[in-house]
């Protein structure tokens, strides 16, 4: 039975109605025989609100206290999601990063994952539970709560998928995938069906949806990542190597036929007033 790790970002969780919708989608997947592990971000802009409150009290909040505070948004989301799943008659349990065994270094605010002890997660899955994990967080050698910095929930999801030997890591967001350019700026931007890890890293370094650290993890562990819309049932953008893509299609995990396309510009990103063009695989 395949394991799928699904990560939902803040815009996908910013209302009770959206949480209910995700719970219904998860139930459908469970009924199809899939094992689902959910990783959730904080609801909407709640992390920004927590930081704002801390800054109202101190211009330089203690980093240990700040990480403890900032981790709470994801914990709220995970508990609410678990409650929503239980209301649909499903067995579900929420876990903090600590409870999920996510061991990090002690760099508060920008912690790096060292290892994951996934025994608790496996035990819960084997007991028929849908495990909902608070993203963006872990714990250090002194059992202090740490946060992973920008893009931390993406990093959590890919790292967990690799640790659990999941078939795929699905990242749900407010767009239907990666585009050839920012669709808010370029009206005729087109969705990209397939990207190599290397191409996605190039785009991620200059502002595309996922943080480079999560893509690097995907590359290191050969974990396929698909970026999809939380609100539309569309195919998204698959990030992996071509051999893994062929394997996923053969096994029916990726249903739409996608082929590698080498000799075209992949995408254009921008950062401030700086432009950069990188060309790959240009024919002689």
Go through each PLM region and give its residues.
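Active-site proximal loops enriched in glycine and acidic residues that flank catalytic Cys/His/Asp
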Residues: 173, 229, 281-283
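Nucleotide/pyrophosphate-binding catalytic subdomain
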Residues: 1-215, 219
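Generic structural hydrophobic/aromatic packing signal, biased to beta-strands
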Residues: 50, 94, 200, 225-227, ...
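Short gly/pro-enriched beta-turn/loop segments at secondary-structure junctions
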Residues: 164, 220-221, 270-274
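A broad, low-specificity signal marking well-ordered, structured residues that form hydrophobic/aromatic
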Residues: 131, 146, 225, 237, ...
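Internal nucleotide-binding/catalytic subdomain
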Residues: 170, 227, 232, 244-249
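Conserved glycine-bearing catalytic or ligand-binding loops at nucleotide- and phosphate-handling centers
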Residues: 207-212, 217-237
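A conserved regulatory-domain signal marking ACT and ACT-like small-molecule sensing domains
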Residues: 238-284
């Amino acid at each position: 039975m395949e394991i799928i790790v699904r990560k939902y970002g803040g815009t996908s969780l910013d209302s009770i109605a959206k949480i209910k919708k995700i719970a219904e989608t998860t139930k459908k997947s469970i009924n199809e025989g899939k094992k689902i592990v959910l990783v959730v971000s904080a609801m909407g802009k709640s992390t920004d609100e927590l930081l704002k409150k801390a800054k109202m009290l101190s211009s330089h909040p203690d980093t240990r206290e700040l990480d403890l505070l900032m981790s709470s948004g994801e914990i709220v989301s995970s508990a609410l999601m678990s409650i929503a799943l239980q209301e649909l008659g499903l067995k579900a349990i929420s876990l903090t990063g600590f409870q999920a065994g996510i061991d990090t270094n002690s760099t508060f605010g920008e912690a790096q994952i060292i290892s994951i002890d996934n025994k608790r997660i496996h035990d819960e899955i084997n007991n028929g539970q849908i495990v909902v994990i608070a993203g963006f967080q872990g714990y250090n050698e002194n059992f202090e709560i740490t946060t992973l910095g920008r893009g931390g929930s993406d990093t959590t999801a890919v790292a967990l998928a690799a640790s659990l030997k999941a078939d795929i890591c699905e990242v749900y967001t407010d767009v239907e995938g990666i585009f050839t350019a920012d669709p808010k700026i370029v009206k005729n931007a087109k969705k990209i069906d397939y990207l190599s890890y290397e191409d996605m890293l190039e785009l991620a370094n200059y502002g595309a949806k996922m943080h480079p650290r999560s893509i690097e993890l995907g590359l290191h562990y050969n974990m396929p990542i698909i970026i999809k819309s939380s609100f539309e049932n569309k195919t998204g953008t698959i990030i992996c190597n071509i051999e893994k893509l062929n394997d996923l299609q053969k096994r029916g995990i990726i249903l739409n036929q996608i082929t590698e396309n080498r000799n075209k510009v992949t995408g254009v990103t921008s950062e401030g007033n700086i432009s950069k063009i990188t060309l790959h695989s240009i024919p002689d």
